[in-house]
Each structure stands twice: as structure tokens, then as C-alpha cells.
């Protein structure tokens, strides 16, 4: 499954990128798509081979977490 996470700061994005890769994801740092708004403009796009609970994907560093389906983004959760 493919996911996209947005962040409040670039530091949070970098930290999450390392975290999610340690969990076994194929991940990359990218600019946030225009369809979505983000505080820092950076996002992490990642694919998980297995399933992780939402609590492990939506850490405190994440602003919003989306499931990616082509050009569509389904909001799975957010931190305020």
C-alpha cells in the first residue's frame, strides 16, 4: 500500500523518513503535491510491504497521513 505523510517542519519529515525506513518501508522525501497543503512543503511518500497499525504510521511528527490511490489521496488521520 502507498502512503503520503505531511509535516509541520522539514526536520520532522527527515526524522520520519528515517523512522519509516527502519520499519521496512521503501520511502522518499518529496515536495508536497499541489492538491495537498502542508506547513513545511515536504512530505514522505512510502510503500509498506506488510501492514502496520495506524498508530505506528501516524506518529506525533506527522501533520496528516494519506493513502495514495493514483492521483487521489484518502485522509487516514491527522495530528493537530
Please give the residue ranges for each predicted region.
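C-terminal structural segments of small proteins and small subunits
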Residues: 48-80
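Alpha-helical structural elements
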Residues: 2, 11-14, 41, 61, ...
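A short beta-strand micro-motif
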Residues: 4-6
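Helix N-cap motif at beta-to-alpha junctions
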Residues: 9-12, 47-51
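Amphipathic, hydrophobic secondary-structure cores in small proteins
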Residues: 1, 10, 21, 26-44
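NTP/phosphate- and nucleic-acid-binding module
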Residues: 10, 14, 74-77
Amino acid at each position: 500500500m502507498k502512503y503520503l505523510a505531511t509535516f509541520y517542519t522539514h526536520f520532522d519529515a527527515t526524522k520520519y523518513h528515517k523512522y519509516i525506513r527502519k520499519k521496512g518501508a521503501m520511502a522518499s522525501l518529496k515536495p508536497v503535491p499541489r492538491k495537498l497543503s502542508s506547513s513545511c512543503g515536504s512530505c514522505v511518500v512510502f510503500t509498506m510491504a506488510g501492514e502496520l497499525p495506524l498508530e505506528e504510521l501516524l506518529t506525533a511528527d506527522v501533520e496528516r497521513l494519506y493513502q495514495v490511490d493514483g492521483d487521489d489521496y484518502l485522509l487516514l488521520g491527522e495530528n493537530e
